[in-house]
Every structure is written in structure tokens, then in C-alpha cells.
Amino acid sequence: MSRSYVFWNSQSGKRGKEGLESLKAKLNDDELDIADVINFAGYREYLSDIKGDDKIYIVGGDGTLNRFVNETDGMNITNDVYYYPAGTGNDFLRDINTTPEECPVKINKYITDLPFVEVNGKKYRFLNGIGYGIDGYCCEVGDKMKAEGADNINYTSIAIKGLLFHYQPTGCVITVDGKRYEYKKVWLCPTMNGRFYGGGMMATPGQDRLNKEHTLSSMLFYGKGRLKTLMAFPSIFKGEHITHKDMVAIHTGKDITVEFDRPTALQIDGETVLGVTKYRAYSAK
């Protein structure tokens, strides 16, 4: 009899537990092997005895998925892998046009040959995108608030306050497949595998995570002051920011390096990396 390995994230709070219980109800006829990814030995050890007809279920948000694809990288998993959303964000689910009611959803085709990012001497796979600029700043501030005991973090509020008062834009050099571009007063410069990141921002509406060329897209918000940038910024949630040609640019390629002129926080699928001046994102193919 096949088994179902269920991995969930207890740090997703109440939503994580609710997601686990909801999935268990849907899989009530299956033999379940449940593990909390915060308190277990790791995927490699846990899945060492997995059989060919066993299934894998990931319960959590984008960060939980990111951890799975990085910790299983190189394991050549051929089993069916399913995703069941819990926590906040869920930009991956939004990008593949799937609702929570339609889950669990099989995700094997979405987690094969994922792109890499190199930052501060380390290399990671990423699922949705690399946030750099005020979006990384928002994650940095949000992490501090969580450490101080805050539960519901309003990242939109953090972004607005950052645009108005706290965040300082940077100079930026972006190199796309060997071609160099320079920008001044850059507010953010994410590089995307999908369209969505940051809890619903459609940064690159033309990006397709399954495109046959395996290209990535970088988007820059640049060149304007605080008030004009703040007025245009909400349009990113519908992907309409790209109509602001004088302050938004998109570059597409397979090998993209972004350099800022001062250290700035970066986020990889919602996971924060501090003090970054440069990152390189590139296709696995």
C-alpha cells in the first residue's frame, strides 16, 4: 500500500495547523506520514525510504515550498508532489491560476529545472522571484516585527511608510545576458520566474514560469521621487505599472546580474537576506 508523506510548517501559525487538518480530512483514506519541517531531520533523511508509488504533500506558503525545492535539490524525486496552501502570501498558487479549493494540486512540472540565484557567496533555487529594494526592506522590517511578537504583519503599510519616509532609493547596474544598463533612483528591482511576488504584486505580467526558453524577467521601478512613485505603486497589484514607461522598465534574459550602490535587504520567495549589494539570477538550462 502506498504512503503519503505530509510536510507542514508549524511556523505558519493557526493557518498552518488548519491547512494540515483540512488536508488530512481530504486524505482520510490514505496512510499518512506527517512531519513538521521546523522540527525534523531534513527531507533527505525523511524520504530515504520512499517508494515509487508514494506521494508527497507540502502544506504551507511560498517559503515552505522554497525550502522543499532547495533541500531536495539533486535528489531526483520522481514521486508525485502536491501542494496544499496555508499561511500567507501564496503567490505561487496565484501564478498557476489555482484556488485553495482546487488543492491539493500536483506541482512536479513547476518545480523541475528551477532557476538559481547567487547572493553573498551562496546559491539557491527560487520558485517565484527575487525581491530587491523596497520589497526586501519590507521583509526586513516584517521580520523584526515578528521577532517582537507581532502576528499580523501589514506589508502594504510597511511599503507605503517606506516610500514616504524611510527607504532610500539606490543607483543600479543590471546586466542581462551580457548587456549592461544603468539606472538612478531605483526603488526596486526584482527578478522573476513567475508573475507574482510579495503577496499579490504582479511585477512581471508577461513572465511565464513554464516558458520553453527558460528566460527570467527583471523589473525596475526607478527615476521618480517619493510621491510620484507612491501614486504609481498600487498599479503593480494588477500589473498595470508597466504602462508607466518613464518609471518602469522590464528586461528579459537567461542570466541577470543586479548591483546596487549600497547594501540593501533581499528576499528569496519571502525569505530575507540582509546586506546585499549584488545578486545573480540565472536559468538552470
Give residue spans per PLM region:
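Short hydrophobic-aromatic micro-motifs
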Residues: 123-131, 137, 182-193, 197-198, ...
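ATP/nucleoside-binding phosphotransfer catalytic cores, i.e., glycine-rich phosphate-binding loops
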Residues: 178, 210-213, 220-285
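Catalytic core of DAGKc-family lipid kinases
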Residues: 5-8, 35, 74-187
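Short, solvent-exposed amphipathic alpha-helical segments in soluble enzyme
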Residues: 21-24, 73-74, 143-144, 205-208, ...
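Short glycine-/acidic-enriched loop or helix-start segments at secondary-structure transitions
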Residues: 16-17, 67-70, 92-94, 137, ...
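Gly/Ser/Thr-rich active-site loops/lids in small-molecule metabolic enzymes
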Residues: 146-157, 194-227
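Mixed-charge interfacial surface used for oligomerization/domain docking
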Residues: 168, 175-195, 199-210
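ATP/NTP phosphate-donor binding region
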Residues: 1-59, 64-66, 70-77, 98-101
